[in-house]
């Protein structure tokens, strides 16, 4: 096994170069621009991957004639990125970059009946709301708020601005002890003591302000005086808040808990704030799991949101609910789809909802008919769609696969697609990608498992190739047609490896029984599924059984550690990134206790709890004496600490 190449793959993000020039206006600012990289050998490299522009959000003009979107460019030497705005016609023609600044334009939307584009930018050091003409001229700052504006939504009548900004919710050590003004230490007296990558001293709050088109006034904190988050950390954004159609109510997502209660519960709710009365109503109080991402119907008669049933289970089925705003009747409308509802959007007449969801290793667009709650797939093929939105009588979405990053497409209701953007064509034209195919394999318990196999470019079945087993993280994250800028299968394949990526037990898109089997059974059937995948592929004459490797991150890192103690000399090399090594220490150290309690089944000291005892009996550290294969270890995880790699 070429160990140097294998290690390089896990660290591909560390090596690259993108173009950058000094901005003429401010000599200390570097303008990171589109790369003109030249690639030799037609193989994917870390440099090529980092040179790619990354398409972000998009917005369709009110008349349906224009599309605005953002693209981020990266510079490894500068250790940062820069996001710019593009505008194109509805058919993809006349695509123009309309900003050329180092100021991170993002969250672009159309305002003032499509005559202006609104966006966030940090021109003057903090993130504020700006506007410009659709050709990039007439740039104007609209807000001068004291803090950063992290997300925003302008009301349907155009007269109010809903925005997100951080509010201080906890005293620092220096606040508590004025005689120690330079103190930076953290005094921990309660959970959660941190959340992912930060010591939690602030919370995002939703604010509403009057907006006259030139600035804001009469700013109101919807959660004034409350220590809660809306949107919820660490990943929530403006999608967790929504205007009603008459611009006098805001629905927001919030988990109104603190301390230990916050650390053990996923019970968030949808609250509706009335701007006129300043009263708040909880419309999902009876549900005990996550309730998130509200959207009002275009006719104003309904509200839809995503809902998980069980408290503490962060990977529960993400169901779509709607509520009749007149009668209060609630309905679980996505029962016919036994997988998670991801992005969704109402049809203009409110009789249909379009959504994306993973099924059998692909994220497709579906139509949900609210007359009978039937679900029909619109798209097909080896792709993942995301970020679906209405586009006249069509849909618009981003699409990617294991062989291509995000581009923007239109989708007709019969499933035909048109690619609108060609952001990285100049790079793809220089590359030869490896073939991707799906194989169904019989597992040890007689079920069928979809496994993706990625071959090297110019694959020759008469040769023998080193082969990697890829172990997915999550643990309940799909092995769909994802495109990764970290664990990129085409970079691995470009170095003449075959990659085997099984949809082992514990992944969505194959029904609830398949998805839920992993909870409390980390060392069980999912590990047998891994062995099935690599053993089946090892039967192929072009797989070199003497050069098998195994790689993974997060739960995949745990899998690597566990397999290292049980692989019976199958593998010649491992790579573990961000994996749990000692389950007992993980239970004590991790801050999101709901995850540990549900997935591990309880605490390790609960001797009468058979699920917990099975979990901790399968901790990888208990099998170290059986390790006989090198394992490069790295950590940047925010829920499994670097101490797991010691």
PLM regions: where:
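Active-site-proximal cap/loop segments of hydrolase catalytic domains
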Residues: 493, 501-646
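Conserved beta-propeller blade repeats
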Residues: 52-67, 102-120, 139, 146-161, ...
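Short, solvent-exposed loop/turn segments at conserved positions within beta-propeller repeat blades
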Residues: 77-81, 123-126, 198-202, 261-267, ...
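C-terminal motif of bacterial Sec signal peptides marking the signal peptidase cleavage site
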Residues: 16-17
């Amino acid at each position: 096994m070429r160990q140097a190449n294998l290690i390089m793959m896990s660290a591909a993000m560390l090596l690259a170069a993108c173009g950058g020039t000094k901005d003429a206006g401010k000599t200390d600012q570097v303008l990171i621009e589109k790369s003109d990289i030249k690639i030799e050998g037609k193989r994917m490299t870390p440099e090529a991957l980092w040179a790619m522009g990354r398409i972000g959000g998009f917005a369709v003009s009110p008349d349906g004639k224009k599309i605005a979107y953002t693209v981020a460019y990266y510079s490894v030497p500068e250790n940062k990125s820069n996001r710019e705005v593009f505008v194109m016609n509805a058919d993809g023609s006349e695509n123009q970059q309309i900003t050329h600044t180092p100021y991170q334009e993002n969250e672009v939307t159309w305002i003032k009946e499509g005559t202006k584009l609104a966006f966030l930018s940090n021109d003057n050091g903090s993130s504020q709301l700006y506007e410009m003409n659709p050709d990039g001229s007439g740039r104007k700052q609209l807000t001068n708020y004291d803090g950063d504006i992290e997300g925003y939504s302008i009301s349907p009548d155009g007269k109010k601005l809903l925005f997100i900004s951080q509010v201080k919710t906890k005293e620092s050590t220096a606040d508590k002890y004025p005689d120690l003004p330079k103190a930076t230490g953290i005094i921990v007296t309660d959970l959660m003591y941190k959340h992912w990558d930060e010591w939690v001293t602030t919370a995002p709050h939703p604010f509403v302000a009057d907006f006259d088109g030139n600035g804001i006034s009469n700013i109101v904190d919807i959660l004034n005086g409350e220590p809660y988050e809306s949107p919820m950390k660490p990943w929530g954004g403006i999608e967790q808040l929504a205007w009603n159609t008459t611009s006098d109510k805001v629905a927001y997502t919030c988990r109104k808990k603190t301390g230990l209660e916050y650390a053990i519960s996923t019970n968030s709710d949808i609250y509706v704030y009335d701007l006129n009365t300043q009263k708040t109503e909880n419309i999902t109080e009876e549900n005990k799991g996550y309730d998130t991402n509200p959207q009002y119907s275009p006719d104003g008669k309904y509200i839809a949101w995503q809902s998980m049933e069980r408290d503490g289970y962060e990977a529960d089925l993400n169901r779509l609910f709607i509520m009749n705003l007149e009668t209060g009747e609630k309905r679980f409308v996505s029962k016919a789809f036994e997988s998670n509802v991801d992005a969704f959007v109402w049809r203009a007449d409110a009789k249909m909802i379009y959504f994306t969801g993973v099924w059998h290793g692909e994220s497709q667009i579906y139509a949900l008919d609210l007359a009978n709650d039937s679900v029909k797939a619109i798209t097909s093929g080896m792709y993942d769609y995301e970020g679906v939105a209405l586009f006249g009588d069509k849909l618009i979405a981003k699409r990617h696969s294991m062989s291509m990053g995000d581009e923007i497409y239109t989708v007709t209701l019969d499933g035909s697609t048109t690619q609108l953007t060609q952001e990285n064509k100049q790079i793809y034209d220089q590359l030869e990608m490896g073939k991707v195919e799906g194989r169904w394999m019989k597992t040890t318990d007689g079920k069928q498992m979809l496994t993706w196999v990625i071959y090297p470019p110019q694959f020759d079945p008469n040769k023998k190739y080193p082969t990697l087993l890829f172990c997915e993280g999550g643990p309940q994250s799909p092995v769909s047609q994802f495109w990764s800028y970290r664990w990129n299968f085409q970079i691995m394949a470009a170095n003449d490896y075959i990659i085997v990526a099984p949809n082992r037990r514990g992944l969505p898109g194959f029904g609830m029984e398949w998805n839920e089997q992993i909870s409390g059974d980390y060392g069980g059937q999912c590990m047998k599924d891994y062995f099935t995948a690599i053993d089946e592929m090892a039967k192929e004459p072009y797989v070199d059984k003497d050069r098998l490797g195994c790689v993974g991150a997060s739960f995949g890192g745990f899998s690597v550690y566990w397999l290292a103690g049980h692989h019976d000399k199958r593998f010649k090399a491992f790579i573990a990134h961000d994996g749990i090594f000692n389950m007992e220490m993980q239970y004590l150290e991790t801050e999101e206790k709901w995850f540990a309690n549900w997935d591990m089944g309880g605490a390790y000291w609960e001797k009468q709890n058979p699920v917990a005892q099975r979990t901790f009996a399968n901790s990888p550290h208990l099998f170290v004496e059986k390790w006989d294969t090198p394992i490069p270890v790295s950590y940047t995880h925010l829920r499994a600490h670097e101490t797991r790699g010691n």
